[in-house]
Amino acid sequence: MAEGGFWKKLTNFFTASEEDEDIIEEDYMDEGYEAEEGTGFVPVQTRAVPVGSTIWVYQPSSFSFDVDSSFIGARIKDGYIIILNLQDLDDLSAQRLIDFVSGALYSVEGKLKAISSSVFLLVPKNVRVESFNEGFGTE
C-alpha cells in the first residue's frame, strides 16, 4: 500500500473535490408555498439568582385552574423561587395543581422539592437545594 494513497484519500475525504465545486445548490420553493411562522422551541436563557431575590409564598384557599396556573406559571417562567402551601386545598385540587407545576418546572428544567405533605419548594434550574435534617430544633 502506497503511503501517498492513504494520505490522498484522507485529504479528499475532508476537503471538497473539483467535482463538488461544479455542483450549484439552489434554494427553491413550490408555486403557492408561503413560509409559516415557526412554532419551534426557543432556548430558555438562565439567569443567576441575585442575592436578595424575591421568594413567592403562595397558599391558595380555593382552586381555580385558570387563575392559579397563570399566576404560578408566570413566576416559574420568570425564574422565581416559590413556596407552595396546599394545606387548604382538597386532595384532587392539590394534585391537579402539582401536576401542572411539575410540567411547568420540567419545561424550564426546574425542580420540585417536598417540604411536607402539603408544602412544596419550586426552584429554577440554577438554584441548588440542600437538606439538613439531623439535629434541627434540638440543642
Curated annotation (Swiss-Prot):
Keyword entries, A-Z: Cell cycle, Cell division, Cytoplasm, Septation
Pfam families: SepF
InterPro entries per UniProt: Cell_div_SepF, Cell_div_SepF/SepF-rel, SepF-like_sf
Gene Ontology biological-process annotations: division septum assembly; FtsZ-dependent cytokinesis
Subcellular location per the Swiss-Prot or TrEMBL entry: Cytoplasm
Chief site of localization: cytoplasm
Gene Ontology, cellular component aspect: cytoplasm
Protein function: Cell division protein that is part of the divisome complex and is recruited early to the Z-ring. Probably stimulates Z-ring formation, perhaps through the cross-linking of FtsZ protofilaments. Its function overlaps with FtsA.
Assembly and binders: Homodimer. Interacts with FtsZ.
Protein family (similarity comment): Belongs to the SepF family.
PANTHER family for this protein: CELL DIVISION PROTEIN SEPF
This protein's name: Cell division protein SepF
Source organism: Coprothermobacter proteolyticus (strain ATCC 35245 / DSM 5265 / OCM 4 / BT)
